[in-house]
Amino acid sequence: MPENAESSIVSVESRELPERITIPPIRGEMVHLRPATVADRMDAIDAYPGASGITGKDRVAERAAVHAWVRRSVAWANGETPTESGVGDPESRRTVAWSIITESDHDGDGEIDAAASYNVIGMIFLIDIDGWARSSRIQVILGQDFRGRGYSRDIMPRVMTYGFAPEPAGLGMHRIWVAVPEQNTRS
């Protein structure tokens, strides 16, 4: 076999996702991200009211989806095999979840804005991660009092940079897409 042919075989990217992932902390200008946990208090920040206008799902469905995404992210970080195959249902594919953390007093009242939720103001996800197509969807969920302040604009490009970065520094995605319901005119 010619030497060039062998080196080209070695350089072909794997289309398999790793069995375990290390979710990196990410620092933005306004907030920072850390791996999400099941204990993060999304209900404390009123993340689900008005969900149908933002994500197209009602409050109950949105809450269930967020909890499932976080569980799948934690499981992947722990090296646990997913219980769903992900073949027929994109919602059951691998997920990476970060909690959005603030340490700021943006409203000037002398207190950290999200003390009741341990500084969590929302979550950002890479969901529907498809190793074969090297693609995923990005989704941001913010607490009701934290919407419209530029947090998504701060963190989405940073998460996308991680998603596009070649392995092992990132996920090596070729495409990251977002789905926004028609009624969510702000996004």
Located regions from the model:
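Short, well-structured alpha-helical patches and their helix-loop capping segments
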Residues: 130, 147-151, 179, 183
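Alpha-helix N-capping/helix-start residues
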Residues: 38, 63, 153, 182-185
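Conserved acetyl-CoA-binding loop-helix of GNAT-fold acetyltransferases
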Residues: 148-165, 185-187
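Conserved GNAT acetyl-CoA-binding A-motif
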Residues: 135, 165-180
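GNAT-family acyltransferases
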Residues: 1-145, 166
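Conserved beta-strand-loop-alpha-helix junction that forms the acyl-donor binding cleft
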Residues: 143-144, 162, 176-187
